[in-house]
Amino acid sequence: KLIVELFATEDAVERYPDLFERAESARIEVQLVSEPVLKALTDTTTPQGVVAVCEQLHSDLEDIIAAKPQLVALLANIRDPGNAGTVLRAADAAGADAVIFSDNSVDVYNPKVVRSTTGSIFHLPVVIGADIATTIESLKSAGIQIFAANGGGAELPTLSKDQLAKPTAWVMGNEAWGFEPETLELVDLEVAVPIYGAAESLNL
């Protein structure tokens, strides 16, 4: 099971009765703790009174490919926890089949990453520690086209519907320096997401 144990204050148990009824039905152990103890268990300034101990969920690239994905996000050297979590959440909202993190990316289970996914990390397959070159080659071999999200690429609206409808892995580079040149050599196409407002750039 995903949730191993819950730590909660008495106030939280009173505020979220449905949550703890479900925990009891699932035979999840609940430990009542004081406010100071709960605050020591979390790094947030104002914790909500409940801390869950959960299993870390890992997926294998082979399993992802075997499931014939239509949309995959591949994060290359992403270092900022907030950005990583936001991409996970956006990928989930877009109906992505998986998110793959390269071996030089931020820890997926960094507390800031987990919080910024707002739960998406628990129901979207995530592959961690992937070698970029090997992963791209494996995806290509499975018939998945590789697009790099790059400001200097072809404008997204210029791509045909047929092209966008094919199984695709979107590669996103580091926040500060973008892509390694050798990574761009492996992709099928560099694509720029247009910015219509006054924003200077997107996060990734």
Q: For the regions a protein language model found, what residue spans apply to each?
A:
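Post-transcriptional modification and biogenesis factors for structured RNAs
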Residues: 1-204
